[in-house]
Amino acid sequence: MRRRPAQLTATKLADEEVPELTLVPDGVSRWTGADLDALRNAARRGGAEAAQQDLERKLCRTIDILGARSQQAQEINTVLTSVARLRENSTFRLYLLTQNHRGVGILKVGVKKLFVTHPVTCGLVEVDPLCVLDFYVDESCQRQGYGKTLYSHMLKAEHVSRPEVLAIDRPSNKLLGFLRKHYGLAAYTPQVNNFVVFHSFFDHTTVSERGKLLRAPSPARALPFSSSTNATAAIGGAKAKNWAPG
């Protein structure tokens, strides 16, 4: 059987209606591949409640649909966010915004090693920042403050006090405008890897002899987190999940 092109499959998925997540309170929740695995294992365990099985299926579908819509909105060839991709990299975190028990926005972050051009020395330096890897709010829900709610929650949950220390992967003009409007971030040097790091990213830093960027200790960097807390909560049921930042 001839396989459908991936682009057509993603387009069809983007056109699906986002399912209702009746057990998920409105607000922002954080999910990792480990959380989704724990939820799946709990749903498949003997004696699992039908509601738990329904939650696992609909939550995963929500993530895949919003990821496909993000791809479509950005007009790129690759889906950046999906359940499969979250399971492939256990360090990535997905923040899901729900309103009226339906997913309306996603924000995926993770630490990556990058080589970027320093705006002062013009030389390449090695950095390992927390990166914004995908950010999308459904078109029907834009200009209602949901994007700011989602981004602010992520900053607090990741213990980021200075938004400029994040690196942004291939930001759209709309996202650059969002960052300029809400966080005053504008000046940056174009990078060959298509990540955007703002000039203020380099404030309070030095460069080691080996070319690694060293940042003065501050609460601006994301602190280590444990996915087991979310996984345990997922097994216990959606209502037991820690919905507060951090």
Curated annotation (Swiss-Prot):
The keyword Acyltransferase applies. GO terms for cellular component: microtubule. Residues 21-202 form the N-acetyltransferase domain. Keywords: Acyltransferase, Transferase. The keyword RNA-binding does not apply. InterPro entries: Acyl_CoA_acyltransferase, Atat, GNAT_ATAT. Its EC number is 2.3.1.108. Acetyl-CoA binds at residues 135-148, 172-181. The record marks 74 as: Crucial for catalytic activity. One of its GO terms (molecular function) is tubulin N-acetyltransferase activity. It catalyses: L-lysyl-[alpha-tubulin] + acetyl-CoA = N(6)-acetyl-L-lysyl-[alpha-tubulin] + CoA + H(+). Pfam families: Acetyltransf_16. Gene3D superfamilies: 3.40.630.30. It is an enzyme of class 2 (transferase). One of its GO terms (biological process) is regulation of microtubule cytoskeleton organization. Belongs to the acetyltransferase ATAT1 family. Specifically acetylates 'Lys-40' in alpha-tubulin on the lumenal side of microtubules. Promotes microtubule destabilization and accelerates microtubule dynamics; this activity may be independent of acetylation activity. Acetylates alpha-tubulin with a slow enzymatic rate, due to a catalytic site that is not optimized for acetyl transfer. Enters the microtubule through each end and diffuses quickly throughout the lumen of microtubules. This is Alpha-tubulin N-acetyltransferase.
